[in-house]
Amino acid sequence: MNNELKLGKRQKQILDFIKQSCKEKGYPPSVREIGQAVGLKSSSTVHTHLVRLEEKGLIRRDPAKPRAIIPLDDEPLLQSEALSVPVIGNVAAGSPILAEQNIDNYLSIPVDFLGSGNHFILKVKGDSMIEAGILDGDYLIVREQADASNGEIVVALLDNEATVKRFYRRDDYVELRPENALMDPITVNNVQVAGKVAGLLRRI
């Protein structure tokens, strides 16, 4: 792009690092990673440079999402091949499940594998869903949504822990049913549904 010729040294370093990260990892770097790569300690200074790059039409940002910094030269490639989906680790008390402090990593998932909506990935811990074919260590692709229909497999938050169960709403309580004959259902008055399981990834 012609606008790249008008960049200062620091902005060019930042743009090159964003492109390199997208190419090598399949997802953009965080603001903190950009600062570390180019020697800037202040996140606000990095943000200022990102605003300038966006004004020059060299990147596209979504301030509501972490790591949503896409170099426009690479945007068609990223959109047509894969999307960067956050992998959720431990859920911090009181925070939305996609808050940056809950995100351990990102995985590139082919767009054809994802439907509509926002998604996250959760690594399965335990064997409560083995009879549904969901094993310990599997990675679940989860569509973010706040409710579910009876019988759907959901990720629910209980005491700030993410659990995977079948969802059933009864008259005055919610039943979270495991797919393991050795385990009992969990009943609660109400529950926060983080999303519906939409797919599964497994390493062999």
From Swiss-Prot:
Q: Which reaction does it catalyse?
A: Hydrolysis of Ala-|-Gly bond in repressor LexA
Q: Which residues form the active site?
A: 128, 165
Any idea which GO molecular function terms this record carries? DNA binding; serine-type endopeptidase activity
BP GO terms, sorted: DNA repair; DNA replication; negative regulation of DNA-templated transcription; proteolysis; SOS response
Q: Which UniProt keywords apply?
A: Autocatalytic cleavage, DNA damage, DNA repair, DNA replication, DNA-binding, Hydrolase, Repressor, SOS response, Transcription, Transcription regulation
Determine if DNA repair is one of this entry's keywords. yes
Q: How does it assemble?
A: Homodimer.
- Return the similarity comment: Belongs to the peptidase S24 family.
PANTHER family, per the entry: LEXA REPRESSOR (PTHR33516), LEXA REPRESSOR-RELATED (PTHR33516:SF2)
Q: Which function does this protein serve?
A: Represses a number of genes involved in the response to DNA damage (SOS response), including recA and lexA. In the presence of single-stranded DNA, RecA interacts with LexA causing an autocatalytic cleavage which disrupts the DNA-binding part of LexA, leading to derepression of the SOS regulon and eventually DNA repair.
What HAMAP family does this protein's entry cite?
A: LexA
UniProt protein name: LexA repressor
Q: Which organism is it from?
A: Syntrophomonas wolfei subsp. wolfei (strain DSM 2245B / Goettingen)
Gene this protein is translated from: lexA
